[in-house]
């Protein structure tokens, strides 16, 4: 057996793609290894969302090149940086063998065999007519998932936010058929999966077909919920413009759909939202939150925020703070704006000094962390179902997550008894990033 090392950067879509890559390359005679030095093929599945993504790639490639100098090593750059940089990767890192975009990963077995045979660099960053989902048997991307699994239902984006590279690296919106998704869910359920996360760049823009009729995400969720052994359903990431009535209804009707939604707003300033080309206002976002609460009162919210977008004034930033205070988020991800080459906002004037960005980010994060801790503390004394999926750092410690996507730690003499199961846990303490709990005495062992 030869060694295969895969490093995945960024979002859940990349994690999912890396699983596909692993499962389609293993049959060529490879097994997964934990270090690049143990590998015969190294695959870097890259993300292009954050600042200096390309530079981080080249830095990692420099380290891997030293390994290549000591052995016959095939180096593959995949993902969104591969799509964005293209042949520039060969120019800056001529020792790379293969560059492949995220929509062409299904061609990797062929590319690897060819590159090793002809000893020449190969690139495939096309957006093929036949999608990777049509080209790969569904069984290949359901392997090796344990208690919780991703299903990609939608890829690409048609929104063209002025700061974002996704439409250029992942292509236009594409939705898989209901039949293909349901088949994948059934296979996962049969393998013991308890929780399914439906993923997409704009997952609530899903518009797949079933027997010639178009379905939206709300209807798809209720269909998947019919699988009895699937106990939890979650979806991410959503765009406010794509929230729709059947999705609201699913949150109210379908108890398997967890009471948590990640719904990025980015800014609370309508002026900045227009410059971002978000196609919604702060008021519309707040109305979405209110509508969700009408359907399920205990729902928790997460968001993304960008501070220091070009032209953001103190007043604009305070509008964001006011929105956060009104919504009260249980979690949030916040970043300083960084220009992405090729996006419209990279050319905007009125770029904000980094010092001001840092000050605003600190203030925003302090507020969000305060809200997060307050939300977690409300759980103390309550009992919640926790899905345990991994062992902790210490002996007898096991880690799970509540329906509100909070990490929960417990100590037990028999951690293996609860691993890969959903167990009622009484919450005894709360911290900013996690809860701790105990198994109630009434729970049969």
Swiss-Prot record:
It is found in: Cytoplasm. Residues 377-441 form the TRAM domain. InterPro entries: Elp3/MiaA/NifB-like_rSAM (IPR006638), Methylthiotransferase (IPR005839), Methylthiotransferase_CS (IPR020612), Methylthiotransferase_N (IPR013848), Methylthiotransferase_N_sf (IPR038135), MiaB_methiolase (IPR006463), rSAM (IPR007197), rSAM_horseshoe (IPR023404). This is tRNA-2-methylthio-N(6)-dimethylallyladenosine synthase. The gene is miaB. Its EC number is 2.8.4.3. Catalyzes the methylthiolation of N6-(dimethylallyl)adenosine (i(6)A), leading to the formation of 2-methylthio-N6-(dimethylallyl)adenosine (ms(2)i(6)A) at position 37 in tRNAs that read codons beginning with uridine. Monomer. It comes from the Bacteria.
């Amino acid at each position: 057996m030869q060694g295969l090392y895969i490093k995945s950067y960024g979002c859940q879509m990349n994690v999912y793609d890396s699983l596909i890559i692993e499962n389609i390359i293993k049959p060529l005679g490879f097994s997964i290894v934990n270090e690049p030095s143990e590998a015969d093929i190294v695959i870097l599945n890259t993300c292009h969302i954050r600042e200096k993504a390309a530079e981080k790639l080249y830095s990692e490639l420099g380290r891997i090149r030293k390994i290549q100098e000591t052995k016959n090593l095939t180096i593959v750059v995949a993902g969104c940086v591969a799509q964005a940089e293209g042949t520039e990767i060969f120019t800056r890192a001529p020792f790379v063998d293969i560059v492949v975009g995220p929509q062409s990963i299904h061609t990797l077995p062929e590319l690897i065999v060819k590159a090793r045979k002809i000893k020449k660099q190969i690139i495939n960053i096309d957006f093929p007519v036949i999608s990777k989902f049509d080209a790969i048997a569904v069984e290949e991307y359901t392997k090796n998932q344990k208690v919780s699994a991703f299903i990609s239902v939608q890829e690409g984006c048609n929104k063209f936010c002025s700061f974002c590279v996704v439409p250029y690296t992942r292509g236009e919106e594409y939705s898989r058929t209901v039949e293909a998704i349901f088949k994948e869910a059934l296979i996962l359920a049969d393998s013991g999966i308890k929780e399914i996360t439906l993923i997409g760049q704009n997952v609530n823009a899903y518009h797949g077909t079933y027997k010639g009729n178009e379905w939206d995400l709300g209807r798809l969720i209720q269909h998947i919920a019919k699988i009895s052994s699937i106990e939890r359903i979650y979806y991410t990431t959503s765009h406010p413009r794509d929230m729709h009535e059947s999705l609201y209804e699913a949150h109210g009707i379908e108890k398997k759909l967890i009471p948590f939604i990640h719904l990025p707003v980015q800014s609370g300033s309508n002026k900045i939202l227009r410059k971002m080309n978000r196609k919604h206002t702060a008021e519309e976002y707040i109305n979405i939150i209110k509508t969700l609460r009408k359907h399920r009162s205990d729902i928790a919210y997460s968001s993304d925020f960008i501070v220091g977008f070009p032209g953001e004034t103190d007043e604009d930033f305070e509008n964001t703070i006011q929105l956060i205070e009104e919504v009260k988020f249980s979690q949030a991800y916040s970043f300083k704006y960084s220009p992405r080459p090729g996006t419209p906002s990279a050319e905007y004037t009125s770029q904000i000094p980094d010092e001001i960005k840092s000050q605003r980010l600190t203030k925003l994060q302090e507020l969000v962390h305060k809200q997060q801790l307050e939300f977690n503390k409300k759980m103390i004394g309550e009992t919640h179902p926790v899905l345990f999926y991994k062992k902790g750092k210490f002996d007898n410690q096991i880690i799970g997550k509540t329906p509100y996507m909070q990490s929960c730690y417990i100590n037990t003499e028999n951690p293996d008894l609860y691993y890969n199961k959903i167990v009622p846990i009484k919450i005894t303490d709360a911290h900013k990033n996690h809860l701790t709990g105990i198994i109630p005495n009434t729970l049969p062992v």
